[in-house]
Design a protein with these regions (language model features):
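Histidine- and acidic-residue-rich, metal-dependent catalytic cores
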Residues: 47, 103-137, 189-191
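Short, well-structured alpha-helical segments
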Residues: 38-45, 58, 62, 78, ...
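His-Asp-centered metal-binding catalytic motifs of divalent-metal-dependent phosphohydrolases/nucleases
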Residues: 64, 79-94, 103, 125-132
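Divalent metal-dependent phosphate-bond-processing catalytic cores, especially two-metal-ion Mg2+/Mn2+ enzymes
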Residues: 19-32, 49-56, 67-75, 87, ...
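An amphipathic alpha-helix signature
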Residues: 27, 31, 41-42, 65, ...
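Extreme N-terminal basic, low-complexity initiation segments
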Residues: 1-11
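Active-site metal-coordination segments of metallo-dependent hydrolases
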Residues: 50-60, 92-104
Length: 220
């Protein structure tokens, strides 16, 4: 019931209008890692503000960046991880695997043009591709950070989680209810089967118990 109410209420506000209030905090974060690259910031902001996005918009981007802060506090997250967060859903059409690959290629193109070293560009693209399955290898600390931050929404409070599910449903508004329900159930089961779901000790402390509660609740 709550999910349906959310779908029919504030989530129908156009994405660009919802995201206007996030421009300043996002720009401050961007300027901290890529000063002088305003054109690239505006390009990414436009992409994250596309009207077909509900969950995969600027709110999600800011949430991932804030989650990275939590995971690395008191240190700052590595710049490559932060840039990967900025690019990880820069291309979003709702096609799993293809979106991440196109986002990684976009990162390679834009960051190379911005003058970043080839090794840094390659690392950002590698991290973006990891978000297609959230399975970083053993010892991949930066990959673990990004994957955990991307999935941090799973460990939210029940009302926040309901808003997340409602927003995801709107991202797939072109799919019928039965097909979406089947696809979503498969995603939830996949997430529950991930061992570990979160890879960093800090993320496990912050979100694991709530994430399992929320995911299991979707299947009941």
């Amino acid at each position: 019931m709550l999910v349906r109410k959310l779908i029919s209420s504030g989530l129908r506000i156009p994405a660009r209008q919802r995201n206007k209030s996030l421009k300043m905090p996002l720009q401050l974060r961007w300027d901290a890692i890529m000063p002088g690259h305003d054109a690239l910031f505006l390009d990414l902001l436009d992409r994250w503000s596309e009207p077909h996005r509900r969950y995969h918009g600027c709110t999600h981007l800011l949430s991932v960046l804030e989650s990275l802060d939590l995971l690395t506090d008191p240190a700052d997250p590595p710049r490559t991880v932060l840039l990967a967060a900025w690019f990880h859903d820069a291309v979003y059409r709702g096609i799993a695997g293809e979106d991440e690959e196109e986002s990684a290629r976009l990162a390679e193109d834009r960051l190379r043009a911005a003058g970043l070293p080839d090794a840094e560009v390659a690392e950002v693209a590698r991290l973006v591709r990891l978000t297609s399955d959230h399975r970083p290898g053993a010892g991949d600390g930066d990959g673990a950070l990004l994957c955990d931050a991307d999935l941090s929404v799973l460990g939210g409070e029940p009302d926040d989680y309901a808003r997340y599910v409602a927003a995801v449903r709107q991202d797939f508004a072109h799919i019928g209810d039965a097909d979406f329900a089947a696809g979503r159930a498969a995603v939830v089961r996949h997430l529950l089967e991930l061992d570990p779901l979160f890879h960093t000790e800090r993320a496990q402390e912050l979100w694991l118990a709530a994430a399992h509660r929320n995911l299991k609740g979707e299947l009941t």
